[in-house]
């Protein structure tokens, strides 16, 4: 499943602007093009829905390449802290003056970097998967003369985790392990976390709570009753769009971590028009033609969420499409069948049809759910699309660093 039809229907100006700017050599191929005004509109909807229900937000940045323009926009809306999914995330955010609220989940902080994280980032909370990691943090925090708040990653029987994301403190070992952590100096257990706590159900066509969430709720009761802890954070990320805030409140969630919701590309957005509108696309161009097929320059195709978990069903049941052409007036009608690319995505295959004739240099538009942090894609930030006065604010790499635009003919 891709988001192309949704973009055509709900934000056609984004497509037309991307094609126009690409054909004028203002946007390079292999770029995730971001409609910054739409991101801002989406963020306002998410924050308003969350604040009205007592839900706190940490914004996730990996999917849009830790982009500083987007981060500052989210800050200006009123979402003041980010979540760093790994150390690299945290470094990028801290370098750009973005406050890190949460780090250590999904990826634990390497021991050699704990001092840097505590002294330079000063995160609100750090997630630990084990007593040993809590001990490492305790030793550094004590040396720095601070008290660091911790979240406990808990694993219950029957919980669901995506491949290569396993680990945490087993529920049956909870009291023993957390009891030991509570005796450490300079750390304080304030909450629990898991992922995914919510996941899109293809049959129900809506996002539903996962067993992980109920493990967290049991854990909170146990820690408060047996250890006398005051748990202030039940961090339950997973498809955190504005539509979900009522459910979060009803289920006792205190913190969530929206990411793809800001660009209108959670799984639910592929099936239903939620409050957030699509705010990005993937732009390429035809490199060459071979028989009836054309080949689009790659670099970001593989980052369109690899087929695992929820996406395996969608990938098997739906084909990928694209738009191709050089004319703004006709581009929305020039739909073609495309092929997904492998990990080394030099090119993406485009299949010809009777209605669309390929030309080298034509723009190619995909509607992907990108994960820029694991790609070679550029990130192009454009403001003014909705007012039909587009301005390119900059082109960035996956780390949020500006790229010299002379490389692209500007």
Regions found by a protein language model. Name each.
Residues 56-201:
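Active-site-proximal beta-alpha core segment in soluble small-molecule metabolic enzymes
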Residues 156-274:
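Active-site loop/helix belt of alpha/beta enzymes
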């Amino acid at each position: 499943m891709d988001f192309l039809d949704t973009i055509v229907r709900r934000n056609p100006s984004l497509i037309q602007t991307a094609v126009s700017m690409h054909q004028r050599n203002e946007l390079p191929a292999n770029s995730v093009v971001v409609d910054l005004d739409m991101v801002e509109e989406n963020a306002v909807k998410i924050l308003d829905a969350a604040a009205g229900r007592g839900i706190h937000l940490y914004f996730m940045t990996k999917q849009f390449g830790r982009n500083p323009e987007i981060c500052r926009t989210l800050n200006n809306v009123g979402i003041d802290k980010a979540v760093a999914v790994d150390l690299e995330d945290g470094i990028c955010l801290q370098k750009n003056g973005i406050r890190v609220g949460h780090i250590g989940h999904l990826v634990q902080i390497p021991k050699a970097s704990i001092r840097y994280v505590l002294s330079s980032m000063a995160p609100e909370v750090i997630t630990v998967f084990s007593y040993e990691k809590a001990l490492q943090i305790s030793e550094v925090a004590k040396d720095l003369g601070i008290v660091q708040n911790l979240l406990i990653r808990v694993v219950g029987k029957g919980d669901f985790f995506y491949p290569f994301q396993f680990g945490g403190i087993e529920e049956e070992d909870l009291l023993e392990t957390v009891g030991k952590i509570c005796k450490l100096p300079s750390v304080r257990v304030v909450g629990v976390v898991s992922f995914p706590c919510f996941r899109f159900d293809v049959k129900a066509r809506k996002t539903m709570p996962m067993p992980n969430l109920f493990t967290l709720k049991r854990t909170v009761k146990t820690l408060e009753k047996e250890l006398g802890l005051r748990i202030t954070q039940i961090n339950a990320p997973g498809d955190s769009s504005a539509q979900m805030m009522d459910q979060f409140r009803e289920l006792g969630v205190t913190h969530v971590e929206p990411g793809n919701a800001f660009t209108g590309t959670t799984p639910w957005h592929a099936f239903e028009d939620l409050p957030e509108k699509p705010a990005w696309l993937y732009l390429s161009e035809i490199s060459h033609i071979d028989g009836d097929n054309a080949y689009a320059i790659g670099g970001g195709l593989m980052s369109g969420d690899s087929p695992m978990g929820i996406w395996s069903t969608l990938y098997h049941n739906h084909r990928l499409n694209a738009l191709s052409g050089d004319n703004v007036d006709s581009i929305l009608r020039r739909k073609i069948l495309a092929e997904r690319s492998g990990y080394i995505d030099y090119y993406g295959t485009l299949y010809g049809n009777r209605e669309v004739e390929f030309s080298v240099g034509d723009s190619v538009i995909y509607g992907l759910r990108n994960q820029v942090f694991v790609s070679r894609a550029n990130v192009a930030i454009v403001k003014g699309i909705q007012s039909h006065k587009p301005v390119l604010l900059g082109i960035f790499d996956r780390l949020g660093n500006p790229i010299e635009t002379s490389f692209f003919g500007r």
